[in-house]
Regions:
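General alpha-helical segment detector with a strong preference for membrane-spanning helices
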Residues: 11-12, 36
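Bacterial N-terminal signal peptides
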Residues: 12-20
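Positively charged n-region of N-terminal signal peptides that target proteins for export
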Residues: 1-9
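Amphipathic, charged alpha-helical segments and their helix-to-coil junctions
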Residues: 26-177
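Sec/Tat signal peptide C-region and signal peptidase I cleavage site
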Residues: 21-25
Protein backbone atom coordinates (compact mmCIF):
# COMPACT_ATOMS: atom_id res chain seq x y z
CA UNK A 1 0.00 0.00 0.00
CA UNK A 2 1.37 3.40 -0.89
CA UNK A 3 1.75 6.36 1.46
CA UNK A 4 -1.10 8.34 -0.16
CA UNK A 5 -3.58 5.53 0.41
CA UNK A 6 -2.46 5.11 4.02
CA UNK A 7 -2.88 8.87 4.64
CA UNK A 8 -6.42 8.72 3.18
CA UNK A 9 -7.34 5.75 5.40
CA UNK A 10 -5.86 7.45 8.46
CA UNK A 11 -7.69 10.71 7.65
CA UNK A 12 -11.00 8.86 7.22
CA UNK A 13 -10.43 7.01 10.53
CA UNK A 14 -9.69 10.28 12.37
CA UNK A 15 -12.78 11.97 10.88
CA UNK A 16 -14.96 8.97 11.78
CA UNK A 17 -13.59 8.86 15.33
CA UNK A 18 -14.07 12.61 15.77
CA UNK A 19 -17.67 12.46 14.57
CA UNK A 20 -18.44 9.53 16.89
CA UNK A 21 -16.96 11.40 19.86
CA UNK A 22 -18.81 14.59 18.93
CA UNK A 23 -22.10 12.73 18.57
CA UNK A 24 -21.76 11.34 22.06
CA UNK A 25 -20.73 14.66 23.59
CA UNK A 26 -21.75 14.91 27.20
CA UNK A 27 -23.34 17.92 28.84
CA UNK A 28 -21.93 19.22 32.09
CA UNK A 29 -23.20 21.60 34.75
CA UNK A 30 -21.72 23.28 37.78
CA UNK A 31 -23.19 24.22 41.09
CA UNK A 32 -21.80 25.92 44.18
CA UNK A 33 -22.77 23.87 47.22
CA UNK A 34 -21.49 26.52 49.66
CA UNK A 35 -23.71 29.12 48.00
CA UNK A 36 -26.72 26.79 48.04
CA UNK A 37 -26.25 25.86 51.71
CA UNK A 38 -25.81 29.51 52.76
CA UNK A 39 -29.21 30.23 51.22
CA UNK A 40 -31.05 27.45 53.06
CA UNK A 41 -32.16 28.64 56.52
CA UNK A 42 -32.63 25.07 57.80
CA UNK A 43 -28.94 24.39 57.15
CA UNK A 44 -27.90 27.49 59.09
CA UNK A 45 -30.18 26.50 61.99
CA UNK A 46 -28.78 22.96 62.00
CA UNK A 47 -25.22 24.33 62.04
CA UNK A 48 -26.06 26.62 64.96
CA UNK A 49 -27.64 23.71 66.84
CA UNK A 50 -24.50 21.61 66.25
CA UNK A 51 -22.26 24.44 67.48
CA UNK A 52 -24.30 24.84 70.67
CA UNK A 53 -24.34 21.14 71.53
CA UNK A 54 -20.63 20.87 70.67
CA UNK A 55 -19.77 23.73 73.05
CA UNK A 56 -21.87 22.15 75.81
CA UNK A 57 -20.20 18.76 75.41
CA UNK A 58 -16.74 20.34 75.16
CA UNK A 59 -17.38 22.14 78.46
CA UNK A 60 -18.28 18.81 80.11
CA UNK A 61 -15.04 17.23 78.88
CA UNK A 62 -12.98 20.25 79.94
CA UNK A 63 -14.58 20.18 83.41
CA UNK A 64 -13.44 16.57 83.89
CA UNK A 65 -9.94 17.42 82.61
CA UNK A 66 -9.75 20.39 84.99
CA UNK A 67 -10.87 18.19 87.86
CA UNK A 68 -8.18 15.63 87.00
CA UNK A 69 -5.61 18.44 86.80
CA UNK A 70 -6.62 19.78 90.20
CA UNK A 71 -6.43 16.28 91.68
CA UNK A 72 -2.91 15.91 90.25
CA UNK A 73 -1.73 19.29 91.62
CA UNK A 74 -3.09 18.42 95.06
CA UNK A 75 -1.36 15.06 94.85
CA UNK A 76 1.95 16.76 93.91
CA UNK A 77 1.64 19.13 96.87
CA UNK A 78 0.84 16.38 99.38
CA UNK A 79 2.90 13.48 98.01
CA UNK A 80 5.60 13.78 100.68
CA UNK A 81 3.02 13.37 103.45
CA UNK A 82 1.24 10.36 101.92
CA UNK A 83 1.81 6.70 102.64
CA UNK A 84 2.43 4.29 99.76
CA UNK A 85 -1.16 3.12 100.00
CA UNK A 86 -2.49 6.69 99.88
CA UNK A 87 -0.21 7.51 96.94
CA UNK A 88 -1.48 4.49 95.03
CA UNK A 89 -5.09 5.38 95.85
CA UNK A 90 -4.66 9.00 94.67
CA UNK A 91 -2.84 7.94 91.49
CA UNK A 92 -5.63 5.49 90.70
CA UNK A 93 -8.26 8.19 91.29
CA UNK A 94 -6.41 10.62 89.00
CA UNK A 95 -6.03 8.00 86.28
CA UNK A 96 -9.71 7.09 86.62
CA UNK A 97 -10.73 10.75 86.23
CA UNK A 98 -8.46 11.17 83.16
CA UNK A 99 -9.93 8.02 81.62
CA UNK A 100 -13.43 9.28 82.34
CA UNK A 101 -12.62 12.53 80.50
CA UNK A 102 -11.07 10.63 77.60
CA UNK A 103 -14.05 8.25 77.35
CA UNK A 104 -16.50 11.14 77.43
CA UNK A 105 -14.55 12.95 74.71
CA UNK A 106 -14.62 9.81 72.54
CA UNK A 107 -18.33 9.32 73.24
CA UNK A 108 -19.16 12.86 72.12
CA UNK A 109 -16.54 13.61 69.47
CA UNK A 110 -15.25 10.24 68.25
CA UNK A 111 -15.74 8.95 64.68
CA UNK A 112 -19.05 7.33 65.65
CA UNK A 113 -19.74 9.75 68.49
CA UNK A 114 -22.82 11.72 69.46
CA UNK A 115 -21.77 14.80 67.44
CA UNK A 116 -21.38 12.68 64.31
CA UNK A 117 -24.82 11.13 64.86
CA UNK A 118 -26.40 14.52 65.56
CA UNK A 119 -24.81 16.02 62.42
CA UNK A 120 -26.02 13.04 60.40
CA UNK A 121 -29.60 13.35 61.67
CA UNK A 122 -29.75 17.12 61.07
CA UNK A 123 -27.89 17.35 57.76
CA UNK A 124 -28.92 14.17 55.92
CA UNK A 125 -32.46 15.32 55.09
CA UNK A 126 -31.14 18.64 53.73
CA UNK A 127 -28.40 16.96 51.70
CA UNK A 128 -30.81 14.36 50.36
CA UNK A 129 -33.27 17.04 49.26
CA UNK A 130 -30.49 18.94 47.47
CA UNK A 131 -29.22 15.75 45.81
CA UNK A 132 -32.70 14.79 44.57
CA UNK A 133 -33.25 18.30 43.20
CA UNK A 134 -29.88 18.31 41.41
CA UNK A 135 -30.62 14.87 39.99
CA UNK A 136 -34.04 16.03 38.78
CA UNK A 137 -32.56 19.10 37.04
CA UNK A 138 -29.72 17.03 35.55
CA UNK A 139 -32.13 14.47 34.12
CA UNK A 140 -34.47 17.18 32.84
CA UNK A 141 -31.67 19.06 31.07
CA UNK A 142 -29.70 16.00 29.98
CA UNK A 143 -26.57 16.63 32.06
CA UNK A 144 -24.26 13.66 32.31
CA UNK A 145 -22.24 15.21 35.10
CA UNK A 146 -22.80 17.94 37.68
CA UNK A 147 -19.71 19.22 39.47
CA UNK A 148 -19.49 21.21 42.70
CA UNK A 149 -17.55 24.41 42.06
CA UNK A 150 -16.94 24.83 45.81
CA UNK A 151 -15.38 21.38 46.23
CA UNK A 152 -11.62 21.40 46.63
CA UNK A 153 -11.36 17.95 45.07
CA UNK A 154 -13.28 18.82 41.88
CA UNK A 155 -10.29 20.74 40.51
CA UNK A 156 -12.37 23.28 38.59
CA UNK A 157 -10.24 26.21 37.49
CA UNK A 158 -12.95 27.97 35.51
CA UNK A 159 -16.62 27.35 35.04
CA UNK A 160 -18.90 29.42 32.87
CA UNK A 161 -21.79 31.00 34.76
CA UNK A 162 -24.00 29.77 31.90
CA UNK A 163 -23.71 26.19 33.16
CA UNK A 164 -24.03 27.03 36.89
CA UNK A 165 -27.37 25.65 38.10
CA UNK A 166 -27.07 26.76 41.76
CA UNK A 167 -29.90 29.31 41.54
CA UNK A 168 -32.13 26.81 39.75
CA UNK A 169 -31.52 24.28 42.54
CA UNK A 170 -32.41 26.90 45.17
CA UNK A 171 -35.51 27.89 43.22
CA UNK A 172 -36.72 24.28 42.95
CA UNK A 173 -36.09 23.83 46.68
CA UNK A 174 -38.31 26.85 47.33
CA UNK A 175 -35.58 29.35 48.20
CA UNK A 176 -35.53 32.14 45.64
CA UNK A 177 -32.53 34.39 45.36
Amino acid sequence: MNVKAMKKILLIAVIALTSVLTASAQKFALLDMEYILKNIPAYERANEQLNQVSKKWQAEVEALNTEAGTMYKNYQNEVVFLSQEQKKSRQDAIMKKEKEASDLKRKYFGPEGELFKKRESLMSPIQEEIYNTVKEIAELRGYSLVLDRASETAGIIFGSPKIDISNEVLQKLGYSN
